[in-house]
Protein backbone atom coordinates (compact mmCIF):
# COMPACT_ATOMS: atom_id res chain seq x y z
CA UNK A 1 0.00 0.00 0.00
CA UNK A 2 1.34 3.45 -0.96
CA UNK A 3 0.02 6.92 -0.38
CA UNK A 4 -1.85 8.44 -3.32
CA UNK A 5 0.32 11.36 -4.54
CA UNK A 6 -2.44 13.06 -6.55
CA UNK A 7 -5.26 14.48 -4.44
CA UNK A 8 -7.94 16.66 -6.02
CA UNK A 9 -9.80 17.38 -2.79
CA UNK A 10 -9.58 15.47 0.49
CA UNK A 11 -13.36 15.14 0.81
CA UNK A 12 -13.83 14.04 -2.79
CA UNK A 13 -11.10 11.45 -2.33
CA UNK A 14 -12.50 10.21 0.99
CA UNK A 15 -15.97 10.09 -0.56
CA UNK A 16 -14.68 7.69 -3.23
CA UNK A 17 -13.44 5.21 -0.62
CA UNK A 18 -16.24 2.71 -1.23
CA UNK A 19 -14.95 1.93 -4.73
CA UNK A 20 -11.49 3.53 -4.92
CA UNK A 21 -10.19 1.08 -2.28
CA UNK A 22 -10.62 -1.68 -4.90
CA UNK A 23 -9.36 0.45 -7.81
CA UNK A 24 -12.83 0.00 -9.29
CA UNK A 25 -14.02 0.45 -12.08
CA UNK A 26 -10.60 -0.35 -13.56
CA UNK A 27 -10.33 -3.77 -11.85
CA UNK A 28 -11.64 -5.93 -9.00
CA UNK A 29 -15.29 -5.71 -9.99
CA UNK A 30 -16.02 -8.90 -8.03
CA UNK A 31 -14.61 -7.43 -4.81
CA UNK A 32 -16.57 -4.23 -5.29
CA UNK A 33 -19.82 -6.09 -5.94
CA UNK A 34 -19.29 -8.23 -2.84
CA UNK A 35 -18.81 -5.26 -0.52
CA UNK A 36 -21.04 -2.51 -1.89
CA UNK A 37 -22.83 -1.10 -0.02
CA UNK A 38 -20.94 -1.82 3.20
CA UNK A 39 -22.90 -2.89 6.25
CA UNK A 40 -21.53 -0.34 8.69
CA UNK A 41 -19.31 2.71 9.08
CA UNK A 42 -18.25 4.47 12.26
CA UNK A 43 -16.71 7.85 13.03
CA UNK A 44 -17.11 10.75 15.46
CA UNK A 45 -20.10 13.07 15.30
CA UNK A 46 -18.10 15.81 13.56
CA UNK A 47 -18.02 13.60 10.45
CA UNK A 48 -21.77 14.07 9.95
CA UNK A 49 -21.01 16.92 7.56
CA UNK A 50 -17.65 15.41 6.63
CA UNK A 51 -16.94 11.81 5.68
CA UNK A 52 -20.50 10.55 6.24
CA UNK A 53 -21.78 13.19 3.83
CA UNK A 54 -19.00 12.92 1.23
CA UNK A 55 -19.43 9.15 0.99
CA UNK A 56 -23.16 9.49 0.41
CA UNK A 57 -22.82 12.44 -1.98
CA UNK A 58 -20.30 10.68 -4.22
CA UNK A 59 -22.13 7.36 -4.10
CA UNK A 60 -25.53 8.74 -5.04
CA UNK A 61 -23.96 10.83 -7.80
CA UNK A 62 -21.94 8.01 -9.35
CA UNK A 63 -24.10 4.95 -8.62
CA UNK A 64 -27.48 6.42 -7.65
CA UNK A 65 -27.21 4.26 -4.54
CA UNK A 66 -26.25 4.42 -0.89
CA UNK A 67 -22.76 3.15 -0.07
CA UNK A 68 -23.40 2.18 3.58
CA UNK A 69 -26.41 0.65 5.30
CA UNK A 70 -25.72 1.69 8.89
CA UNK A 71 -23.80 4.52 10.48
CA UNK A 72 -22.67 4.92 14.09
CA UNK A 73 -21.86 8.49 15.06
CA UNK A 74 -19.58 8.48 18.11
CA UNK A 75 -19.71 11.14 20.80
CA UNK A 76 -16.56 13.08 21.65
CA UNK A 77 -14.24 12.22 24.54
CA UNK A 78 -14.25 14.96 27.19
CA UNK A 79 -12.35 15.39 30.44
CA UNK A 80 -13.69 14.03 33.72
CA UNK A 81 -15.75 17.20 34.28
CA UNK A 82 -17.39 17.03 30.86
CA UNK A 83 -15.24 19.78 29.31
CA UNK A 84 -13.44 19.66 25.97
CA UNK A 85 -9.82 18.61 26.34
CA UNK A 86 -7.36 21.37 25.51
CA UNK A 87 -3.62 21.79 25.94
CA UNK A 88 -4.15 25.41 26.94
CA UNK A 89 -6.48 24.30 29.75
CA UNK A 90 -4.09 21.57 30.84
CA UNK A 91 -6.80 18.91 30.94
CA UNK A 92 -5.45 16.67 28.17
CA UNK A 93 -4.91 13.02 29.15
CA UNK A 94 -1.95 11.16 27.71
CA UNK A 95 -3.33 7.68 26.89
CA UNK A 96 0.13 6.13 27.12
CA UNK A 97 0.14 6.84 30.85
CA UNK A 98 -2.73 4.40 31.19
CA UNK A 99 -1.50 1.98 28.52
CA UNK A 100 1.64 1.52 30.62
CA UNK A 101 -0.17 1.32 33.98
CA UNK A 102 -3.52 -0.40 33.48
CA UNK A 103 -3.10 -1.69 29.92
CA UNK A 104 -4.96 -1.00 26.68
CA UNK A 105 -7.74 -3.49 27.45
CA UNK A 106 -8.67 -1.60 30.61
CA UNK A 107 -9.07 1.59 28.61
CA UNK A 108 -11.11 -0.20 25.95
CA UNK A 109 -13.38 -1.71 28.60
CA UNK A 110 -13.79 1.58 30.44
CA UNK A 111 -14.65 3.46 27.26
CA UNK A 112 -17.09 0.74 26.19
CA UNK A 113 -19.01 0.56 29.45
CA UNK A 114 -18.80 4.21 30.51
CA UNK A 115 -21.57 5.51 28.24
CA UNK A 116 -23.52 4.86 25.05
CA UNK A 117 -21.19 5.11 22.03
CA UNK A 118 -23.24 7.94 20.50
CA UNK A 119 -23.04 10.01 23.70
CA UNK A 120 -20.10 12.16 24.85
CA UNK A 121 -17.81 10.26 27.23
CA UNK A 122 -16.17 11.85 30.25
CA UNK A 123 -12.70 10.33 30.63
CA UNK A 124 -11.83 9.90 34.30
CA UNK A 125 -8.43 8.32 35.07
CA UNK A 126 -9.90 6.92 38.28
CA UNK A 127 -12.51 5.13 36.19
CA UNK A 128 -9.80 3.37 34.18
CA UNK A 129 -8.13 2.20 37.38
CA UNK A 130 -11.49 0.99 38.69
CA UNK A 131 -12.15 -0.98 35.48
CA UNK A 132 -8.72 -2.56 35.75
CA UNK A 133 -9.20 -3.57 39.38
CA UNK A 134 -12.84 -4.60 39.17
CA UNK A 135 -12.98 -6.46 35.86
CA UNK A 136 -9.50 -7.52 34.84
CA UNK A 137 -7.94 -8.30 38.22
CA UNK A 138 -11.05 -10.30 39.06
CA UNK A 139 -10.76 -12.27 35.83
CA UNK A 140 -7.06 -12.85 36.42
CA UNK A 141 -7.58 -14.01 40.02
CA UNK A 142 -10.34 -16.43 38.99
CA UNK A 143 -8.17 -17.85 36.22
CA UNK A 144 -5.11 -18.09 38.48
CA UNK A 145 -7.06 -19.91 41.18
CA UNK A 146 -8.39 -22.50 38.75
CA UNK A 147 -5.13 -22.84 36.81
CA UNK A 148 -3.03 -23.43 39.93
CA UNK A 149 -5.20 -26.22 41.27
CA UNK A 150 -5.83 -27.69 37.82
CA UNK A 151 -2.07 -27.89 37.33
CA UNK A 152 -1.57 -29.64 40.68
CA UNK A 153 -4.22 -32.21 39.76
CA UNK A 154 -2.98 -32.65 36.20
CA UNK A 155 -6.41 -31.62 34.93
CA UNK A 156 -6.92 -32.08 31.19
CA UNK A 157 -10.07 -30.39 29.80
CA UNK A 158 -9.91 -32.69 26.79
CA UNK A 159 -10.09 -35.86 28.89
CA UNK A 160 -13.55 -37.37 28.39
CA UNK A 161 -13.09 -39.57 31.47
CA UNK A 162 -13.35 -36.56 33.79
CA UNK A 163 -16.21 -34.86 31.95
CA UNK A 164 -19.43 -34.67 33.97
CA UNK A 165 -22.78 -34.53 32.11
CA UNK A 166 -25.01 -31.60 32.96
CA UNK A 167 -27.67 -33.73 34.65
CA UNK A 168 -25.08 -35.13 37.07
CA UNK A 169 -23.71 -31.76 38.13
CA UNK A 170 -24.50 -29.96 41.36
CA UNK A 171 -27.19 -27.30 41.65
CA UNK A 172 -24.45 -24.68 42.01
CA UNK A 173 -22.78 -25.73 38.76
CA UNK A 174 -26.04 -25.79 36.86
CA UNK A 175 -26.93 -22.41 38.29
CA UNK A 176 -23.73 -20.73 37.05
CA UNK A 177 -24.09 -22.37 33.63
CA UNK A 178 -27.67 -21.10 33.44
CA UNK A 179 -26.55 -17.59 34.43
CA UNK A 180 -23.78 -17.69 31.82
CA UNK A 181 -26.21 -18.81 29.12
CA UNK A 182 -28.73 -16.09 30.00
CA UNK A 183 -25.99 -13.47 30.11
CA UNK A 184 -24.62 -14.56 26.72
CA UNK A 185 -28.05 -14.37 25.10
CA UNK A 186 -28.72 -10.94 26.59
CA UNK A 187 -25.23 -9.82 25.55
CA UNK A 188 -25.94 -10.83 21.95
CA UNK A 189 -29.36 -9.17 21.95
CA UNK A 190 -27.90 -5.89 23.21
CA UNK A 191 -25.15 -5.97 20.58
CA UNK A 192 -27.76 -6.40 17.86
CA UNK A 193 -29.47 -3.26 19.23
CA UNK A 194 -26.08 -1.48 19.40
CA UNK A 195 -26.31 -1.24 23.19
CA UNK A 196 -22.65 -2.18 23.56
CA UNK A 197 -22.32 -0.31 26.86
CA UNK A 198 -25.20 -2.23 28.43
CA UNK A 199 -23.85 -5.55 27.16
CA UNK A 200 -20.46 -4.80 28.71
CA UNK A 201 -22.00 -3.88 32.05
CA UNK A 202 -23.98 -7.12 32.09
CA UNK A 203 -20.83 -9.13 31.38
CA UNK A 204 -18.93 -7.33 34.14
CA UNK A 205 -21.76 -7.91 36.62
CA UNK A 206 -21.73 -11.61 35.76
CA UNK A 207 -17.95 -11.95 36.14
CA UNK A 208 -17.70 -9.99 39.39
CA UNK A 209 -20.93 -10.87 41.20
CA UNK A 210 -22.20 -14.21 39.92
CA UNK A 211 -18.97 -15.92 38.93
CA UNK A 212 -16.32 -14.60 41.31
CA UNK A 213 -18.15 -13.45 44.43
CA UNK A 214 -20.76 -16.20 44.45
CA UNK A 215 -19.72 -19.29 42.47
CA UNK A 216 -15.95 -19.33 43.02
CA UNK A 217 -16.17 -18.52 46.72
CA UNK A 218 -18.58 -21.42 47.23
CA UNK A 219 -16.49 -23.79 45.12
CA UNK A 220 -13.05 -23.35 46.66
CA UNK A 221 -13.26 -26.33 48.98
CA UNK A 222 -14.26 -28.53 46.06
CA UNK A 223 -10.92 -27.80 44.37
CA UNK A 224 -8.97 -27.95 47.63
CA UNK A 225 -10.06 -31.56 48.07
CA UNK A 226 -7.09 -33.81 47.27
CA UNK A 227 -9.33 -36.78 46.50
CA UNK A 228 -10.74 -37.11 42.99
CA UNK A 229 -14.52 -37.07 42.94
CA UNK A 230 -17.43 -36.43 40.62
CA UNK A 231 -18.08 -33.12 42.35
CA UNK A 232 -14.47 -31.99 41.92
CA UNK A 233 -14.43 -32.93 38.23
CA UNK A 234 -17.72 -31.10 37.77
CA UNK A 235 -16.21 -27.94 39.23
CA UNK A 236 -13.02 -28.26 37.18
CA UNK A 237 -15.00 -28.55 33.97
Predicted regions and their residues:
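Structured secondary-structure scaffolds
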Residues: 1-152, 176-219, 223-224
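Acidic, turn-prone loop/beta-hairpin segments
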Residues: 153-185, 217-237
Amino acid sequence: MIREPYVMDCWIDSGCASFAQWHYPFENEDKFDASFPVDYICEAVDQTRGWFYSLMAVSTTVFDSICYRRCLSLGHILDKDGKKMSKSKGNVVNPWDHFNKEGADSIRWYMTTQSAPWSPTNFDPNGVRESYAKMFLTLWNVYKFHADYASLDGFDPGNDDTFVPLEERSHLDRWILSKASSMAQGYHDKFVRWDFHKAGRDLEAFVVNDFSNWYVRRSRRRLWNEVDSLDKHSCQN
